[in-house]
A protein has these predicted regions:
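Extracytoplasmic "Venus flytrap"
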Residues: 31-58, 62-80, 84-86, 92-96, ...
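Short beta-strand elements at the ligand-binding edges of bilobed clamshell
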Residues: 64-66, 122-148, 162-163, 194, ...
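Hydrophobic alpha-helical segments within soluble ligand-binding/sensing domains
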Residues: 32, 74, 131-158, 203-205, ...
Length: 319
């Protein structure tokens, strides 16, 4: 289900004094070079499909590169796009840092860059035109706010295990930051175990097994994405515990599999992160090529879903 997009009140930026060229396709067709993080999760697969389908529908030629979770692969892909003289470059950064050099190369080549899903930590914001994606800090806050509300009638200590996303990635850093920002106000909330599980189901299970071996007093699992949460559910069940009851589970993304797990009582709450960015990305790409002003930040509007909403919402999940 596509969510509407909210445009922040950031100042508008112009792509260039003149319209950007259409790229090296040899026609008037716009060429978009896109470097994807990888295919590490159901969310990412849905994101890729959304971009591919939207490009075809918009008549935009898409040059697609899968970075396989490696920054060096993305840098290589961006340099290839520069050499190919594409009209626009878009990418979802594997990690937040280390992009200035290659983005400066794109800027020098007068090829505008769009960030999708994830941000970069560059101090020079002129290196990209806009950032389209979720507010990951707010997602972390929403996850924590649910836990605070669910725990408000007890003064007992709440022991939390955290499955982090890829180390150094914007969603992992920001979802942790937002969550801690909220729970840090009450000393009864304690993170007793926290480790990366690389946003994958297999690692989610593996790391959760280690958590359970070291800590038999975990009350809550906070997973930075659904795939890690679903892997952790397997580990919890194999340990003879009931996910959603013995250990409450908070996850982020909103995939169909997670909604099914919520409907089954195994996940307690999911904070939505919408992967269907393709149509908006193509709209932005056309604006950039035409030289139209573009907001510096475009934030997706997303919800929070609990078990009592899961069954009704499940048929609407398209990913």
């Amino acid at each position: 289900m596509l969510k509407r997009l909210l445009i922040t009140t950031s100042a508008l930026v112009l792509t260039a004094a003149t319209a950007v060229g259409c790229g090296s396709s040899g026609s008037d067709q716009t060429v978009l070079g896109f470097s994807q993080v990888g295919a590490e999760s159901g969310w990412r697969t849905a994101n890729t499909k959304s971009i591919q389908d939207a490009a075809a529908a918009a008549g935009i030629q898409l040059k697609f590169a899968d970075a396989q979770q490696k920054q060096e692969n993305q840098i290589k892909a961006i340099r290839t796009f520069i050499q190919q003289r594409v009209g626009v470059i878009a990418f979802s950064p594997v990690v937040a840092s280390g992009w200035d050099t290659v983005l400066k190369e794109a800027k020098d080549a007068k090829i505008p860059v769009i960030l999708t899903d994830r941000a970069v930590d560059s101090a020079d914001t002129s290196l990209y035109v806009t950032f389209l994606g979720s507010d990951f800090v707010e997602e972390g806050r929403r996850a924590a706010n649910w836990l605070v509300e669910a725990s408000k009638n007890s003064n007992d200590t709440v022991n939390i295990a955290e499955l982090q996303g890829t180390t150094g990635s914007a969603p992992a850093t920001d979802r942790k930051k937002g969550f801690q920002e909220v729970i840090g106000a009450d000393p009864k909330f304690k993170i007793i175990a926290s480790q990366t599980a690389e946003f994958t189901r297999a690692k989610g299970k593996e790391v959760m097994q280690a958590f359970l071996a070291a800590h038999r007093d975990i009350n809550v699992l906070y997973a930075h994405n659904d795939d890690m949460a679903l892997g952790a559910i397997q580990a919890i069940e194999e340990a003879g515990l009931k996910p959603g009851k013995d250990i409450k589970i908070i996850s982020i993304d909103g995939t169909r599999d997670a909604f099914q797990a919520m409907a089954d009582g195994k996940i307690n709450v999911v904070v939505e992160c919408n992967p269907l960015l393709g149509p908006k990305l193509m709209e932005i790409t056309k604006d950039v090529v035409a030289g139209r002003p573009t907001p510096k930040r475009i934030v997706t509007d997303e919800g929070v879903y609990t078990q009592d909403q899961a069954a009704a919402a499940l048929p609407t999940r398209t990913y």
